[in-house]
């Protein structure tokens, strides 16, 4: 009996260790209930083949003559040859799976107050006067002076409380295989000959 108990205690942790799993527990208070379940499966396959070839050949010839009397003798030759090839193959296989559960309960409370107002004050001063100058002419004046003040005030307050507790569990598995081969060959050749007299 003890042997079976020891064997059971050894096999169960090994089985759990081979499969990825996780568990997250958190306590709070939240009056709204929400339940979500989801399952996702995705297969991805990609095959890619690339083949290419490039070759070129160039030739140039130059003849001429020039000396101190106005004659120039020049001969030249230019050869350029090149070859470029590219071949490749790429393959990718993938498989993805996801399954999860989410359960949540909670409570949300909020309290707030807001006060806002404005105050405007205006004061006007009026003066009138007059008199005579040295030539006997009468002068009079009127003077207005207006001042205004605008005051705004506001008061805002808010208090909220959010509590939540729930359990989240997720299991996943991913398998990916890939293979890539590439071959590049570049062979440049150049020959330049220049002769002058």
Curated annotation (Swiss-Prot):
Q: Supply the source organism for this entry.
A: Fasciola hepatica
Its taxonomic path starts at: Eukaryota, Metazoa, Spiralia, Lophotrochozoa, Platyhelminthes
Signal peptide (UniProt feature, chain positions): 1-17
The protein depicted here goes by the name: Putative eggshell protein
Asked if the Swiss-Prot or TrEMBL record annotates the protein with the keyword Signal, the reply is: yes
Q: Per UniProt, which keywords does this protein have?
A: Signal
Question: Sorted alphabetically, which Pfam families does this protein's record hold?
Answer: TES
């Amino acid at each position: 009996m003890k042997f079976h108990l020891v064997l059971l205690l050894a096999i169960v942790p090994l089985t759990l260790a081979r499969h990825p799993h996780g568990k997250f527990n958190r306590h709070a208070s939240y009056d709204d209930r929400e339940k979500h379940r989801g399952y996702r499966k995705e297969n991805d396959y990609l095959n890619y083949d690339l083949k290419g070839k490039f070759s070129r050949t160039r030739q140039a010839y130059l003849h001429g003559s020039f000396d101190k009397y106005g004659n120039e003798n020049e001969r030249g030759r230019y050869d350029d040859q090149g070859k470029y090839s590219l071949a490749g193959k790429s393959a990718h296989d993938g498989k993805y799976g996801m399954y999860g559960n989410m359960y949540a309960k909670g409570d949300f409370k909020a309290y707030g107050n807001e006060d806002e107002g404005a105050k405007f004050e205006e004061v006007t001063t009026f003066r009138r006067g007059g008199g005579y100058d040295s030539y006997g002419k009468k002068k009079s004046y009127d003077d207005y002076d207006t001042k205004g003040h605008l005051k705004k005030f506001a008061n805002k307050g808010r208090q909220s409380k959010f509590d939540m507790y729930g359990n989240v569990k997720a299991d996943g598995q991913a398998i990916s295989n890939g293979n890539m081969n590439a071959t590049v060959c570049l062979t440049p050749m150049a020959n330049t000959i220049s002769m002058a007299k």
